[in-house]
């Protein structure tokens, strides 16, 4: 299923659990983050996340605006 068009109802369970990259996804049960910079275990990252840039493992965690 196309991760950009898969259904991600607000507050609902995510049907694209393994590749949740839906724009504006607000699922509460995404198995992975909706933006590549967020760690999979960050529940907040299933909602509004903005990537700030950076490189490396540590920067990956730091640059995610919703994982603080």
Swiss-Prot record:
A divalent metal cation 3 binds at residues 16, 20, 25, 30. A divalent metal cation 6 binds at residues 38, 42, 45, 67. The keyword Zinc applies. The modification Phosphoserine is found at residue 33. Residues 1-30 are annotated as: Beta. One of its GO terms (cellular component) is perinuclear region of cytoplasm. The modification N-acetylmethionine is found at residue 1. It holds the Pfam family Metallothio. SUPFAM superfamilies: Metallothionein (SSF57868). A divalent metal cation 7 binds at residues 51, 64, 66-67. Binds heavy metals. Contains five zinc and one copper atoms per polypeptide chain and only a negligible amount of cadmium. This is Metallothionein-3. The lineage of its organism: Eukaryota, Metazoa, Chordata, Craniata, Vertebrata.
